[in-house]
Amino acid sequence: MKKQLINSFTDKYSLNGIIESVKWSVVSADNQIKTSSITDDKNVLAFVTLKDSAKLSDIEFGVNDTAKLKKMLSVLGDEVEIAPTTTNDKVTSITFTSEGTDIQYVTSDLSVIPPVPALKKMPGFNLEIPLTKEFVSTFVKAKGALSDVDTLTLTKDKKGKLKMTLGYSTTNSNRINLDIKANEGKNDLGKTLHFNAKYLKEILTSNSECENSVLKISDAGIAHVEFDNESFNSNYYLLEIKNVA
């Protein structure tokens, strides 16, 4: 397996280092490695699939320190082989080998990995925002310009114009407004909604190779975006942030 695939996989499920603890599940019949993860504040759920099982059999194991795993992987070459060590049918470590060098990463008991709640029936999404290269680039730059702002706000004015605002406040504030060009027939917003801008930025940057994705918004307070290519499938759910002044 290419080491870059593993690095991209960890970036996508960890949101570039925000989430550390996850469960890896190998599904050999589908040639996939799957993860589900959740942020500490429980405002984002991430479901990421790597479409390459690295020739592993069906196993599950916990990775409790993704940042350390990434640092250890950095000493290896471009091509990596993966092998588990098991004791009493439990994976206790994973060995990554490349060009005469190997690393052993000690896995965690699944009981210490934060559980990710099962998704119930999703509400209908009434707003769809195409994630064009231009929109993504502008949003990432806007978040960089207001690095201390962690909230994005979706609003609709009396004329029906949709905006995404970083730095929104009911009082005078530094803010950046982005016009929203929604998909036809999915351009309604029934109320003002707030989501975590930092998380959305990391979702977008960790999936920057994907095109034609859509950010879907529900007035029920849920946002969803899916990215798919030949190597990965990534689904993220953001929950509304309430009580924003």
Model-derived features: where do they sit?
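DNA polymerase sliding clamps and clamp-related checkpoint/processivity subunits
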Residues: M1-G17, V22-A145, T153-A245
